[in-house]
Amino acid sequence: MEIIFTVNHNNLIAFSDLNSGQIFKMVNTDDVRTFGEDCLCMKTDTGDLVILAGTKYHCGMLCEPDCYLSDGSNTIMEKVPNAVIALT
């Protein structure tokens, strides 16, 4: 699975999966944070931080283990264990 970030003029990020063509919830860039070597987290509607890239071994316990995406609802929709992240 390949995940692409798209940042628009309103400072929002859309997450899209090129393999399925699905576009996930847009979030404000203030809710997306990077840390460590290879970690990226997104704050979901529930206020939880989840890892989009990296693993718990790289990221420690700052985010939920493994990788998740939000579908814009109050639930974390999809586990993405080996996501490749690219910024466009």
Where are these regions (language model features)?
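Polar/charged alpha-helical tracts
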Residues: 1-2, 20, 45, 81-82
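Mixed-charge, Lys/Arg-rich low-complexity intrinsically disordered regions
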Residues: 1-19
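Conserved beta-strand residues within beta-sheet cores
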Residues: 12, 38-40, 81
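Short stretches within intrinsically disordered, low-complexity N-terminal or propeptide regions
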Residues: 16, 55, 85-88
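Short coil-to-beta transition motif at edge beta-strands of beta-rich domains
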Residues: 16-30
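Acidic, low-complexity, intrinsically disordered interaction modules
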Residues: 27-76
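Mixed-charge, Lys/Arg-enriched low-complexity segments
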Residues: 75-88
